[in-house]
Curated annotation (Swiss-Prot):
Family (UniProt): In the N-terminal section; belongs to the carbohydrate kinase PfkB family. In the C-terminal section; belongs to the cytidylyltransferase family.
Catalytic activity, as annotated: D-glycero-beta-D-manno-heptose 7-phosphate + ATP = D-glycero-beta-D-manno-heptose 1,7-bisphosphate + ADP + H(+); D-glycero-beta-D-manno-heptose 1-phosphate + ATP + H(+) = ADP-D-glycero-beta-D-manno-heptose + diphosphate
Subunit structure: Homodimer.
Nucleotidyltransferase found in the keyword field: yes
Origin species: Shewanella sediminis (strain HAW-EB3)
Protein name as annotated: Bifunctional protein HldE
Catalytic site: D264
Length: 476
């Protein structure tokens, strides 16, 4: 499926649900407390991020959509911090304030990119407070195209059926990020987005694709829901509707670093895309790409439009693979690193591509997720190899290399050595063929200094460009 991003700035979205504050206390730890067998963390940084439904709204705003956020908060410092955080990014708050209840806060203590403990500050809200919030939210229905119900089972959304009916009657799509085993509460919704665990909590265990589709179709019929998007971790997503074949979308995530807020990212990308005019399959593909980006980040995070553009160009081959310029490659590498991919780089003239080259490049690619081949341009080959070389011009050499399954990117360089371009791109692993010493490999010191590594691979015995040329000349 070719995926195109809509004009997100045209999207008008209302998010209703359980808002919370994600608070991070971060610092180094180097000793154990004398009071108990626990680490001592010396806090050096405190950061507040909008979480729950607030993170959904923040994701919509980061993509460029117009968004309002309705939620329940206490009259406390956490509510003030949450308000400041969302307003700074263009989200309009519509709070229902409750006396004597705290704003839901999740405090995480972090050290060395690891979460040591989480402390939750929350109390359940009475059902009357949920009714008051939904009544407050009805006033915004005339000005939006999509409503998101972000349910974390904290009491903000207890019985939303009447609200859903009013929204649908006004032509507003209602998307639900569900919680719990009672999907009857979301009767009449346009779309629900359970993960696989939430889906199986409702329908029982699922052992095959066919069973997943069958049970999803039954839910659609039972609760008058238009569509279900089941998020399935490493298996991607599956969209089931009543009037079309199921759509399986494979994951684009290469490495999962932190799943905090991933579900928020999915539904916010769906809502923004649909509100901006995308059809449902397109919106699901955009949401899948956004999820692949966010799980490679630490903590509750958002995804920007530019990140989506770069990810889609790389994942769908519109640009970013094959023969590229240095600047194009720099953008592609930035996205690859967001996905947690290990990048390998090698270089050479590759004047007459032979079996030894193919074997060597295959070995190099197997050491990581992506392989860059930097190629000497024609002038540098002539300086290094002498008159009569190269046999093949650089554009032809690059085209042949780019056609190999093992090669992701081919980039030219003009100098006699690739030191400058390696120093700019800084791969995770620099590979060189032959009998080099690691300390003599151009760019090796820079790669190691940046935290990468250098490796020497052997070539096939008796196979070289020089010997091939000599054999050709001898047989003329």
């Amino acid at each position: 499926m070719k995926v195109s991003l809509p004009a997100f700035e045209k999207a008008k979205v209302l998010v209703v649900g359980d808002v919370m504050l994600d608070r991070y206390w971060t610092g180094p730890t180097g000793r154990i407390s004398p009071e108990a067998p626990v680490p001592v963390v010396k806090i050096s940084q405190i950061e507040d991020r909008p979480g729950g439904a607030a993170n959904v709204a923040l994701n919509v705003a980061t993509l460029g959509g117009q968004v309002s956020l309705a939620g329940i908060v206490g009259k406390d410092e956490a509510a003030d911090a949450l308000t400041t955080g969302i307003q700074a990014l263009g989200v309009e708050p519509k709070w229902h304030c409750v006396e004597g209840k705290p704003t839901i806060t999740k405090l995480r203590v972090m050290s060395r990119n690891q979460q040591l403990i989480r402390l939750d500050f929350e109390e359940a809200y009475p059902e009357d407070e949920s009714k008051a919030l939904l009544t407050l939210s009805e006033s915004a229905l005339d000005n939006v195209a999509v409503v998101v119900l972000s349910d974390y089972a904290k009491g903000a959304i207890t019985q939303p059926q009447e609200f859903i009916q009013k929204a649908i009657a006004k032509g507003v799509k209602v998307l639900v990020d569900p919680k719990g085993s009672d999907f009857s509460r979301y009767r009449g919704a346009s779309l629900i987005t359970p993960n696989m665990g939430e889906f199986e909590e409702v329908v029982g265990s699922v052992s095959s694709e066919a069973e997943l589709v069958e049970k999803a179709q039954a839910l659609l019929s039972e609760f008058d829901i238009e569509a279900i998007l089941v998020t399935r971790s490493e298996k991607g997503m599956t969209l089931i509707t009543a009037d079309a074949p199921e759509l399986h979308i494979p994951t684009v995530a290469r490495e999962v670093y932190d799943v905090t807020g991933a579900g928020d990212t999915v539904i916010s990308a769906l809502a923004t895309s649909l509100a901006a005019g995308s059809d449902l399959p397109q919106a699901c593909a955009i949401a899948n790409t956004a999820a692949g980006i966010v799980v490679a980040k630490l903590g509750t995070s958002t995804v920007s439009r530019i990140e989506l553009i770069r990810a889609l160009s790389v994942n769908h081959g519109e640009s970013g693979f094959g023969a590229v310029s240095e600047d194009q490659l720099a953008y592609a590498l930035e996205q690859a690193r967001l996905r947690g991919e290990r990048v390998v780089m090698t270089n050479g003239c590759f004047d007459i591509l032979h079996a030894g080259h193919v074997s060597y490049l295959k070995q190099a690619r197997e050491l990581g997720d992506r392989l860059i081949v930097a190629v000497n341009d024609d002038d540098s080959v002539k300086r290094l190899k002498g008159e009569g070389r190269p046999v093949n011009q650089s554009d032809r050499r690059m085209a042949v290399l780019a056609g190999l399954a093992s090669v992701d990117w081919v980039v030219p360089f003009t100098e006699d050595t690739p030191q400058r371009i390696i120093s700019r791109l800084l791969p995770d692993l620099l590979v060189k063929g032959g009998d080099y010493k690691i300390e003599d490999i151009a760019g090796g010191k820079e790669v190691i200094a940046a935290g990468g590594s250098v490796k020497v691979l052997g070539f096939e015995d008796g196979v070289s460009t020089t010997s091939i040329i000599e054999n050709i000349m001898a047989n003329q």
